[in-house]
Amino acid sequence: GRCTVTSAAALKEDNKIVGGSECPKNSVPHQVSLFNGYNFCGGTLLSEEWVLSAAHLQNHLKDGYISSRSDVEVRLGEHDIWEPEGTEQHIMSAKFIRHPDYNSRTQDSDIMLIKLSRPATLNSYVRPAPLPSKCASEGTMCQISGWGTRFPHKLQCLDVPLLSDDACFNSYPFQITENMICAGYLEGGKDSCQGDSGGPMMCDGELQGVVSWGHGCALRKKPGVYTKVCNYLSWIETTMASG
């Protein structure tokens, strides 16, 4: 099982960031691994008690990959997910709040909040990502990060440029909504694969994207598609405030 749904038939995927390299250790302190015996999804810490991820990971909940919500372990402060390094905090999830407009067919509003069963301890290894002050513009270089579902076991990072709405639409005609942004290289070779789903795309130090979908890995003219976080600020803030 992968934290992945593509709106068209998925091509075979490698489940890792393609063309990336190992992040400097603990350089992405907001990075979360959602763990159920293996890293099945990424996420982003927003506060002591809340994590942002992709709504489509709930397909795992109903498909039986995860027998109940409390089975999801939220892993913070990780770098090598196979080795205890002394910086980790493992906290069970308490509840999932999927965006009410999420559409599993189109993947529109592919965004979800996860409340932790207890607050995380914030330190230099575990620190929330800032939400965006405004939407990011085309050409901005952003960083995506994740482990994928199988390999590698050390956190991978990759810098990708935000594409224009036109380039995004042309890559995926009639599949892009106003709540999606594309990033990556139209020539292929570098991309986030779906094992990294739900994880962060950081632009100028702010969380602008949630890894959502894309067709295969690093294919020519097929950039990665991300949920546009700046469209959801009021929902995120209201939901976190109401607990």
Report residues per predicted region.
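Cytosolic, low-complexity regulatory segments enriched in Ser/Pro/Gly with interspersed Lys/Arg
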Residues: 1-11
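Conserved H-D interstitial segment of serine endopeptidase catalytic domains
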Residues: 11, 51-54, 58-104, 158, ...
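Conserved hydrophobic/aromatic beta-strand scaffold that supports enzyme active sites
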Residues: 31, 50-52, 88, 111-113, ...
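A conserved glycine-rich beta-strand in the N-terminal activation segment of trypsin-fold
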Residues: 31-48, 106-107
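Active-site substrate-binding loop(s) of clan PA
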Residues: 61-63, 85, 97-103, 119-152, ...
